[in-house]
């Protein structure tokens, strides 16, 4: 028997029962659901990560849809329970959905939503922040000041790397990888090398045009190159940022061998998913190469870190906050709620998950569609 969990209820007489496994930022998402006759139940349990049993208890006997989090294990057990309870839709409040077994969802006819686009710039900005913080040793310097160790300017104090004219490498030049590349190229006049399974024509055009602009103004132009292998990026780039999806092809993409291929004083940033890096190998590499620096937002066994990582002065570590701006988090909540609502109401799936702006304008009603359903094709409603 699943144990009861604490909830907060909005619009108790609503016809459709929608459960959110966590309180989410803003109220627009709640209002949009209530306006369409949903009873909204929000889990207010104090524990951060809900177990499958907790979520089973939330789903109960009748549930039309669930908004869940990337920390939860959405597989066979939960999708079968949701389907038994009459549920049509689940949405992650995240763009990444490696915590979701989409095949299991397909088996039970449950739509799986995610929240692309609204977090692109916010996530890229955190990757850029970590790049700068690592290049200029900001966290080490901050700790030094707070410890009362500053006793005057010195020529060698916290000397770091100049980004201008160096090469930024992007692995996974999708929405976020491309946004990050543009920030680093335009903001710091870095040259770009990228690796992705697909060509990023828009990104290439952007760098070409910016290079021409610089040249016309008498400055050295920036350049771009699409690498034919990830190794090329690792060997050549001074700053490397990881932005692929997490799947079988990207698990431990950065491992002992690939770390060795990188420059001794390179900077590695990860705002994608922890398991893209073999974290134990990274700790060894950081220990053996004090000039090598890393900025991590995500960890292999979140919320834990591999032994030794927290002691590394050449690592900057933050707790999975890359999408944590107010506008973005409220927007993610809205998109997740509208994914679920759209399926409940029988709306079509939005035609382009890369263009979700119409759902985010608070001054107008959102389109009658689910913004992003990743298994729409498999369920026959693309
Ligand atoms: N740290 C955080 O808070 C956040 C993390 N993320 C992570 O970032 C990921 C990317 O998000 P978006 O840019 O919106 O997705 P996207 O789908 O636009 O981009 C992913 C890119 O990775 C590429 N890719 C896939 N396999 C690859 C491989 N083996 N080698 C090289 N490239 C490969 C794809 O072709 C695609 O261009 C998400 O799946 C999520 O896991 C996203 C938002 C916030
Ligand atoms: O959206 C995602 O995939 C995250 O990791 C959180 O924003």
From Swiss-Prot:
Keywords: Glycolate pathway, NAD, Oxidoreductase, Peroxisome, Photorespiration. It is an enzyme of class 1 (oxidoreductase). One of its GO terms (molecular function) is NAD binding. PANTHER family: 2-HYDROXYACID DEHYDROGENASE-RELATED, GLYOXYLATE REDUCTASE 1. GO terms for cellular component: peroxisome. Disulfide bonds: none annotated. It comes from the Eukaryota. It catalyses: (R)-glycerate + NAD(+) = 3-hydroxypyruvate + NADH + H(+). Belongs to the D-isomer specific 2-hydroxyacid dehydrogenase family. The active site is at residues 273, 302, 320. The keyword Cytoplasm does not apply. InterPro entries: D-isomer_2-hydroxyacid_DH, D-isomer_2_OHA_DH_cat_dom, D-isomer_DH_CS, D-isomer_DH_CS1, D-isomer_DH_NAD-bd, NAD(P)-bd_dom_sf. This is Glycerate dehydrogenase. The keyword NAD applies. NAD(+) binds at residues 175-176, 271-273, 297, 320-323. It comes from Cucumis sativus (Cucumber). Pathway: Photosynthesis; photorespiration; 3-phospho-D-glycerate from glycine: step 3/4. It is found in: Peroxisome. One of its GO terms (biological process) is oxidative photosynthetic carbon pathway.
